[in-house]
């Protein structure tokens, strides 16, 4: 088994003027992570995230109804959505995020059942980029065995990758299940499949690199989104962002 864990924090500090009052929440602006439980209203509304900066990824799940996991990511923007439990490409619809980018205090949900059915409970997980700790970003695959290098500014311990523009699994890498390069022990977040070894990926001191032309992480011309979290949540010099050393 493997477990990945995020610590939130304070249960005070709602900022802005949200139109939907959370049922419960935990904010950690230092690590750029928060969790918010809320009851849907069935109409477009705003919720607090407590991060002090606009979140770069938001994952929402209905708790009482059968709905897909809805994902917002800043590289693709609020006109798009993608589903964590499916391998499909991103969709375009205003009914998810109301075509409204998150602000430093609030994020918006519209009327889609995956994010805002009246009287039903939801949980939202928000992630903001923090230098030396976490990063949401995107890259373009090159389809070569000498694949793309992705700069994060830190040595990742956890990497979640999805081809946003094609049918492809959500691919998970970490530094515990194999622990050395090339890291090819993968899990697929959108299936119940056992661990596989389809890819070669190097975890480096300042990012990660695909050493494979495997389409799920390096399809030529495809746009990939990712969430990466650091092994050591620090930098040697905050101003210049010097990363921790390689393994």
PLM region descriptions:
Residues 1-247:
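Surface-exposed molecular-recognition determinants
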């Amino acid at each position: 088994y493997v477990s990945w864990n995020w610590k939130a924090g304070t249960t005070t500090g709602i900022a802005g003027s949200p139109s939907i009052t959370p049922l419960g929440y935990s904010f950690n602006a230092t690590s750029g992570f928060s969790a918010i439980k809320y009851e849907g209203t069935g109409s477009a509304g705003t919720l607090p995230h407590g991060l002090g900066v606009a979140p770069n990824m938001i994952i929402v799940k209905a708790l009482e109804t059968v709905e897909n996991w809805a994902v917002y990511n800043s590289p693709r923007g609020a006109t798009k959505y993608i589903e964590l439990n499916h391998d499909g490409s991103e969709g375009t619809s205003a009914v998810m995020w109301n075509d409204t980018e998150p602000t430093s205090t609030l994020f918006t949900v519209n009327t889609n059942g995956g994010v805002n059915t009246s009287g039903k409970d939801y949980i939202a997980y928000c992630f903001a980029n923090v230098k030396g700790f976490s990063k949401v970003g995107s890259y373009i695959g090159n389809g070569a065995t000498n694949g793309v290098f992705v700069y994060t500014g830190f040595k990742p311990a956890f990497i979640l990758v999805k081809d946003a523009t094609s049918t492809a699994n959500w691919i998970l890498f970490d530094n515990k299940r194999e622990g050395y390069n090339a890291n090819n022990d993968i899990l697929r977040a959108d299936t119940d499949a056992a661990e596989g070894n389809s890819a070669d990926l190097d975890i480096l001191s300042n990012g990660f690199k695909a050493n494979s032309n495997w389409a799920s992480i390096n399809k030529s011309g495809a746009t990939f989104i990712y969430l990466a979290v650091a092994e050591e949540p620090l930098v040697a010099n905050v101003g210049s962002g010097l990363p921790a050393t390689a393994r």
